[in-house]
Amino acid sequence: MDFGASAKNLSTPVKGAKIVPNMTVDELVKEYAGCAFGAGRLAEAVDIYYEMLASGKTTKFFGLAGAMTPAGMRNIIADLIRDGYIDVLVTTGANMVHDTVEALGLHHYKGSDCANDIQLRHECIDRIYDVYLPDQHFTDLEEFLQGVYSGLPQENLSIRQVLTEIGKNLDDDSSILKTAAEMGVPVYCPALQDSVIGLQAWLYKEGNPLHVDAFADMHEFMDICYGAESAGTMLLGGGVPKNYILQSMLVTPRSFDYAIQLTMDRPETGGLSGATLDEAQSWGKVGEDAKSVTVYADSTITLPLIVSAVRTRLSKR
């Protein structure tokens, strides 16, 4: 038996969490740190995210996939942007669709995943797992978007510029797009066509001049990557936002120094959404000495816990 190796592998005992009344979220997370499995990973994510946000030299990327805005996560993200904790946001079109719906005063409603979907269809109600919204919301959204598109400059625009203009036309401090436009934080959506915002842009373009270059954002995005002294990313889910962020480092001399992934996807099928951050190291996307962790849990549970704990630590600096 190699007693030296055994001593190394048996150096950190699992410490049972102790829960007491009136604990803060950060105190709870510190108890998680002594635990294994998902609890230990979440505590590690808090440590990494704190270091990433506290660093004065790290460019902070945020990947937003899934249905985070209809689930109620938009305030958290808007506040992170407002307080300077997101430098670059990459998102799916759907998240910005539902952000805009809310910004127009149109609500999402708590429903049930056990609904009769045929009945919901007859009632003109759309379902996103256990969230409902009426079809009429999309009619109102479409009217708003058509008005925005009609006021766009008659020149070649990037998708980022289109999203900025949408944000400028919103009046809701909880809006991700409005906050990003006010703070000068770029919002990139490489697959905007895969959303109502993109669909309405195409419909408008069928009868009106609208010039959007789907590749125009690449140069600007790569300039940000090249200019980053250090880079870190928080990835909610996978898909296009995750890959768009991570692949950017393939054309720069560096890799991500910090990376956190909150996901429910599995790696066994070989898809990007479930790919581990360790796998990303083989591509050079995440650095050899990077601080990284994947937390396998619902992002609507883990993101609020992580952000709350990190904000507590940041307030004590």
UniProtKB/Swiss-Prot annotation:
The keyword NAD applies. It holds the Pfam family DS. Its EC number is 2.5.1.46. SUPFAM superfamilies: DHS-like NAD/FAD-binding domain. Keywords: Hypusine biosynthesis, NAD, Transferase. One of its GO terms (molecular function) is deoxyhypusine synthase activity. The active site is at residue 285. InterPro entries: Deoxyhypus_synthase_arc (IPR022899), Deoxyhypusine_synthase (IPR002773), Deoxyhypusine_synthase_sf (IPR036982), DHS-like_NAD/FAD-binding_dom (IPR029035). Disulfide bonds: none annotated. GO terms for cellular component: cytoplasm. It catalyses: [eIF5A protein]-L-lysine + spermidine = [eIF5A protein]-deoxyhypusine + propane-1,3-diamine. Its cofactor is NAD(+). Pathway: Protein modification; eIF5A hypusination. Catalyzes the NAD-dependent oxidative cleavage of spermidine and the subsequent transfer of the butylamine moiety of spermidine to the epsilon-amino group of a specific lysine residue of the eIF-5A precursor protein to form the intermediate deoxyhypusine residue. NCBIfam families: dhys, PRK02301.1. Belongs to the deoxyhypusine synthase family. This is Probable deoxyhypusine synthase 1. It comes from Methanosarcina mazei (strain ATCC BAA-159 / DSM 3647 / Goe1 / Go1 / JCM 11833 / OCM 88) (Methanosarcina frisia). The gene is dys1.
